[in-house]
């Protein structure tokens, strides 16, 4: 809502009666706030202003400011807290967690899609469709966005975490935030921090599976008893043997099954080096049989790193710490008897349907054509052929129109048919002022070259299965530059990916995995609604492989590949 600049209608100090009414409205809208907290938010004597404004789409919004910062905004008689308020009261709204890379999309006006939601150990917050929600980033409880739930928690889980999760209204770094002191989110530690990133990935994904399991029980009429989980007897029962085998032994078998299944059917050589957390989160959990839950903490290994050490001792995989504290699988022996003898279980019909529906379509490069746009000063030349100012034409069409015009007006020289006589219209369209009375005839190739040069550039981009997109101006290639930072550190910067249908966040995630380097997605300087990807180090060689070999983009649409490190150099 505030991704673009808004128009202020009025800004006045609040009246005493309106202040009391606002305090009462806040108490009703946010019942979790105590009396003291409401008084702190809506002080009795400090300056409090009411700002009436129109958002860029025309919505009438009332904003309440205190101490120069917007604290609340009202839309269609509903009150919403701003991020400034949520930083003081981080638990005011149920919060959904997402990755830092997603923030750029939210700031640009996008809604939060469910595939970008990180499920915490406790599962997703319980909300109904239309409930107010906050959005926070992994590792920090300070909210960075406010929105409305697009569906209930039950619907989110039933959808397999696909589709729109939250309709975003306001974010950190948007224009409403900019109207305040522009402070950054405070660092607020998670309520239940874990010891390592590995455990976070394990617990987060396990929490998602646990939530899905509980939702299934509710749908079957079996409502779980929350008190039962706290009963010592029930905890003891959970450790008893099942089907004659201890639970720990069963979890060890399930862990190995998911591991071998992932290596045999999901992980490819091109994926290496592969972060161990990615192996667990993106491959092993999805290989878990329907109706079962993979929980490493219930296995004898307790941690993924210990399990992978065991698999390395069996010479199935090779694990290395490519960067400090981050382990990756760098090699897999796909000829190992444990992998070759493993039989991939047949998926159920339901899981097959889900997988087919959720499978991402491979990237296909667009078909790109250079076009020419008719400017105002050349309109007369193209009117007879039915074209007007702003019409776009291919080069072959321009040649045909010029040829027809010359023949129709008897401009071809009778003595030398390679020459074309210039009439007043052609003179005005293609000659310079100092040539007007000097040049009377031109060869065909010179005439056509001059005509194409004076037309305005345009281009057409057609993605497979979509309608063509025509844009005026020159086509900007994917621009790769190498920037030298302090202490001689290099950063690879990529721009203009969106023109070719590439998502900067997706490209950044791929480069982060393959280069084992940190990546940042940020607004491109001087470019409206465009993002750039920064990768630590000289990663132009990896970029070239991705863009040319995998995405199959023609090299003429990529500039900067010559800056790739030479063989034998870093």
Swiss-Prot record:
Where is the protein found, in the record's own terms? Cytoplasm
Q: Name one GO biological process term.
A: IRES-dependent viral translational initiation
User: Residue limits of the SWIB/MDM2 domain?
Assistant: 370-454
SUPFAM superfamilies linked to this entry: eIF1-like, PUA domain-like, SWIB/MDM2 domain
Any one Gene Ontology molecular-function term assigned to this protein's record: translation initiation factor activity
Taxonomic superkingdom: Eukaryota
Q: Which residues form the PUA domain?
A: 93-173
- Name a GO CC annotation attached to this entry: cytoplasm
Q: Where is the PTM N-acetylmethionine found along the chain?
A: 1
Which Pfam families does this one have? Pre-PUA (PF17832), SUI1 (PF01253), WH_eIF2D (PF25304)
Q: Does the keyword Oxidoreductase apply?
A: no
Q: Does the keyword Phosphoprotein apply?
A: yes
Residue positions, PTM Phosphoserine: 238, 241, 348
InterPro entries tied to this protein: EIF2D, eIF2D_N, eIF2D_SUI1, Pre-PUA, PUA, PUA-like_sf, PUA_eIF2d-like, SUI1
Key words of the record: Acetylation, Cytoplasm, Initiation factor, Phosphoprotein, Protein biosynthesis
Domain SUI1 stretches: 478-551
Locate the region Disordered.
178-200, 215-243
This molecule's function is given as: Translation initiation factor that is able to deliver tRNA to the P-site of the eukaryotic ribosome in a GTP-independent manner. The binding of Met-tRNA(I) occurs after the AUG codon finds its position in the P-site of 40S ribosomes, the situation that takes place during initiation complex formation on some specific RNAs. Its activity in tRNA binding with 40S subunits does not require the presence of the aminoacyl moiety. Possesses the unique ability to deliver non-Met (elongator) tRNAs into the P-site of the 40S subunit.
The Swiss-Prot or TrEMBL record describes its family as follows: Belongs to the eIF2D family.
Q: What is this protein called?
A: Eukaryotic translation initiation factor 2D
Supply the source organism's classification: Eukaryota, Metazoa, Chordata, Craniata, Vertebrata
């Amino acid at each position: 809502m505030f991704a673009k600049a808004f128009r202020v209608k009025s800004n006045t100090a609040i009246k005493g009666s309106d202040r009391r009414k606002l305090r009462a409205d806040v108490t009703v809208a946010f019942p979790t706030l105590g009396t003291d907290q409401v008084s702190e938010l809506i002080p009795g004597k400090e300056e409090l202003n009411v700002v009436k404004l129109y958002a860029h789409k025309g919505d009438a919004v009332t904003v309440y400011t205190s101490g120069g910062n917007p604290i609340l905004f009202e839309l269609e008689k509903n009150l919403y807290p701003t991020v400034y308020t949520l930083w003081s009261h981080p638990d005011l709204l149920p919060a959904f967690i997402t990755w830092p890379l997603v923030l750029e999309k939210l700031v640009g006006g996008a809604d939060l899609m469910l595939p970008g939601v990180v499920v915490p150990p406790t599962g997703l917050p319980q909300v109904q469709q239309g409930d107010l929600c906050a959005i926070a980033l992994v590792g920090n409880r300070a909210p960075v966005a406010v929105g409305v739930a697009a569906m209930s928690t039950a619907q989110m889980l039933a959808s397999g975490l696909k589709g729109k999760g939250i309709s975003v209204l306001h974010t950190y770094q948007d224009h409403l935030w900019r109207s305040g002191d522009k402070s950054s989110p405070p660092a607020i530690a998670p309520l239940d921090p874990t010891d390592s990133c590995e455990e976070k990935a394990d617990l987060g994904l396990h929490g998602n599976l646990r939530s899905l399991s509980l939702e299934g029980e509710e749908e079957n009429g079996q409502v779980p008893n929350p008190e039962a989980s706290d009963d010592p007897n029930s905890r003891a029962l959970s450790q008893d043997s099942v089907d004659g085998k201890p639970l720990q032994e069963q979890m060890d078998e399930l862990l190995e099954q998911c591991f071998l299944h992932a290596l045999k059917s999901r992980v490819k050589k091109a994926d290496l080096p592969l972060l161990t957390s990615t192996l667990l989160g993106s491959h092993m959990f999805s290989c878990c049989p329907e109706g079962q839950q993979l929980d490493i903490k219930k296995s004898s290994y307790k941690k993924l790193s210990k399990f992978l050490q065991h698999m390395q001792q069996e010479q199935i995989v090779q694990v290395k710490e490519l960067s400090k504290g981050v382990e990756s699988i760098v090699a897999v022996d796909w000829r190992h008897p444990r992998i070759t003898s493993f039989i991939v279980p047949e998926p159920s019909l339901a899981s097959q349907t889900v997988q087919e529906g959720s499978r991402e379509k491979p990237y296909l490069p667009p078909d790109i054509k250079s076009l020419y746009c008719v400017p105002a000063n050349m309109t007369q030349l193209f009117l007879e052929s039915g074209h007007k100012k702003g019409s776009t034409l291919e080069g072959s069409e321009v040649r045909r129109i010029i040829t027809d015009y010359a023949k129709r007006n008897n401009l071809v020289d009778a003595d030398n048919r390679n020459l074309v006589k210039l009439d007043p219209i052609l003179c005005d369209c293609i000659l310079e002022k100092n040539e007007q009375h000097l040049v009377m005839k031109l060869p065909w190739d010179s005439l056509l070259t001059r005509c194409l040069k004076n037309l305005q550039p345009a281009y057409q981009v057609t993605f497979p299965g979509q309608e063509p997109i025509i844009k005026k101006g020159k086509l900007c290639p994917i621009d790769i530059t190498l920037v030298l930072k302090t202490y001689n550190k290099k950063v690879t910067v990529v721009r203009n990916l969106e023109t070719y249908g590439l998502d900067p966040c997706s490209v950044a995630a791929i480069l982060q995995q393959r280069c084992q380097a940190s990546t940042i997605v940020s607004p491109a300087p001087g470019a409206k609604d465009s993002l750039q990807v920064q990768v630590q180090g000289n990663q132009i060689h990896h970029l070239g492989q991705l863009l040319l070999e995998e995405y199959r983009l023609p090299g003429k649409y990529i500039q900067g590949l010559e800056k790739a490190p030479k063989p034998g150099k870093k």
